[in-house]
Amino acid sequence: MIYTYKECMKKWSSNYQIKKQIDTGNLFQIEKGIYSDTPDVSTLAVISVKYPKAIFTMDSAFYYHGLTDVIPDEYHIATDKHSIYLSDKRIRQYYILSDILNIGVTTMTRRDAVIRIYDKERMLIELLRYKNKLPFDYYKEILGNYRGLIYELDIERIQEYAATFPKPKMISEALDAEVF
């Protein structure tokens, strides 16, 4: 299990006791402010604990949902538009408007981590919104995989999401032309 410094202080009540747990091998410091009771912890688990309000999006979400086999070089996370810059080199941060940030958020378990991630319906909207910023082959691969999943998706939810986002007409036209 992964602990933050705050959780360690609650459990062991002092820095001395935390260091004592580390020295005896009961606790391992993974990085500054992040501890674990096992020595091997995935980077995904560390990021999900270190940034609990962050939501996995774009390349990371496409990969975790099985829509592409391209493993992203960075963890793509969405944060509120007014959030501070995260200087973590492992992360690519997307600033999202507050009123649409939490639309379509769900949780997923990947190996030893429980992550907050956008659902497949939300990610279809994101794919269409950012299609000009993605490599064409990558876009077509993901779109083709969505066409294969069309009967598993909640079409009503997709239409609700499309109406909520900026430029709803453009999103609806792209859905009709390229997906349905």
Positions of the model-derived regions?
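Nucleic-acid-binding surface
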Residues: 3-7, 17, 22, 35-180
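A short, conserved structural fragment
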Residues: 25-31
